Amino acid sequence: MKYRDLREFLHHLEARGELKRIRHPVDPYLEMTEVCDRTLRAGGPALLFEHPRGYDTPVLGNLFGTPHRVALGMGAEEVAALREIGELLAFLRQPEPPKGMRDAWNQLPVFRRVLDMAPKTVRKAPCQERVIEGEDVDLSRWPIQTCWPGDAGPLITWALVITRGPEKERQNLGIYRQQVIGRNRVIMRWLAHRGGALDFAEHQRHYPGEPFPVAVALGADPATILGAVTPVPDAISEYAFAGLLRGSKTELVTCKGSSLQVPASAEVVLEGHIHPGDTAEEGPFADHTGYYNETETFPVFTIDRITHRADPIYHSTYTGRPPDEPAVLGEALNEVFVPILRKQFPEIVDFYLPPEGCSYRLAVVTIRKQYPGHAKRVMLGVWSFLRQFMYTKFIIVTDGDVDARDWKAVVWALTTRSDPRRDATFIDHSPIDYLDFASPISGLGSKMGLDATNKWPGETDRTWGTPATMDEATRARVDAYWAELGLD
């Protein structure tokens, strides 16, 4: 099923028992995090806090708190169906030349779908039903969560940040957290290599000293939100990809104070500028690792205007030790990554990012091994192929007979098929998430690859062991009388 806006999605979730309305007053200061965290760990529903203590605006939490709800948000009924989205992205990233006229004709509908999903601009939009400007802009009137006791202050989390670099037609969409430090000022935490930061840096080079326009959308439709965290090919905008997921063009409206375009159906939009040289120390905040991060300097976003629906819903989340909502998102999007990786490395059987590894810091890859050194080629390829894996610290590569998602099986392969000295690959001075305080230098550290595959001649002089397994004939004979044993 496809959803035009967030409210249609919430209506569908409620009809399926996947949304719970909370009428008891719950405080956005710490209490919402505790309620959401308990609910998410139990595999519970999305939560709509209808009466946040001290505020009139409802708060939506745990929207993507299960992989199934992520799949629903992307227009799929089951998590397994996300592989089809991955296959589409794999094709769009690396379209194969047609083998003939018939093949070209068969590929035409795919490209036509992409071209037909260019976003549509509208003049009137729900997100601009109300306009707050100037001195009336006051973030303290909004139920912005303070998530953990040691957090530096309230934090805007599910913020879809829209920017555009000079002379670029395509806008960049990214999700960056924002610490509230004043009635109309937030710290924009974007890393230097992220799209928003790159657009800002380019703007400063082209227009030194001039403010950089930024828009932030809160409560967009699920396809647009999820499109911003999916590995979309550079040639396709996130808005167009959201249209593909939704099956209809993304409707955009131009901001009141800039040429940036935001989702017309969003609940709330923040419009403003980042002024060159206006920075502040951000943090500390608890993050997806389960620890409080160090403070670091980032640009300050000054909000000139807030537009919103007549009765807005504030969409929020929290981050903490996995599982949290980002970990669940990573678990679901894992299914999207598999076809993309297989397009580049057909020998990959499966690819898994365990949520306990913060959804990106450790990867398990199973392959159909074809030659000595094959595992090392795959681990180096994974690190370099998609920027999403630039911060993956550990990669374990093993054979296709091992279930990548069964940690017991992976540990068995690791301890029986690898030698620490021979099979460990280290890469020094490589990019690392600056939130990773375990690295010796902020933003720079090492990576480790472990070859847990069966070894081929040239990799060992030893006679390699053969796994002890029961033959199929014996299994079949026991299956025939198993029920009579009364052991189940």
Curated annotation (Swiss-Prot):
Please list the cofactors this protein needs.
Answer: prenylated FMN; Mn(2+)
Which residues does the entry assign to the active site, renumbered to this chain?
287 (proton donor)
Q: Which InterPro entries match?
A: UbiD, UbiD-like_C, UbiD-like_N, UbiD_bacteria, UbiD_Rift_dom
Gene3D superfamilies documented for this protein? Single helix bin, UbiD C-terminal domain-like
For this UniProt entry, the molecular function terms from Gene Ontology, in alphabetical order, are: 3-octaprenyl-4-hydroxybenzoate carboxy-lyase activity; metal ion binding
Question: Where in the sequence is the signal peptide annotated?
Answer: none
Provide the top EC class. lyase
Give the CC-aspect GO terms.
cytosol; plasma membrane
Supply the Pfam families for this chain: UbiD (PF01977), UbiD_C (PF20696), UbiD_N (PF20695)
Principal localisation: membrane
Instruction: Quote the EC number.
Output: 4.1.1.98
* Residues the record lists as binding prenylated FMN: 175-177, 189-191, 194-195
Q: List the keywords (alphabetical).
A: Cell membrane, Decarboxylase, Flavoprotein, FMN, Lyase, Manganese, Membrane, Metal-binding, Ubiquinone biosynthesis
Quote the function comment for this protein: Catalyzes the decarboxylation of 3-octaprenyl-4-hydroxy benzoate to 2-octaprenylphenol, an intermediate step in ubiquinone biosynthesis.
**Record-stated family:** Belongs to the UbiD family.
Q: What is this protein called?
A: 3-octaprenyl-4-hydroxybenzoate carboxy-lyase
The record lists the organism as Halorhodospira halophila (strain DSM 244 / SL1) (Ectothiorhodospira halophila (strain DSM 244 / SL1))
Upper lineage is: Bacteria, Pseudomonadati, Pseudomonadota, Gammaproteobacteria, Chromatiales
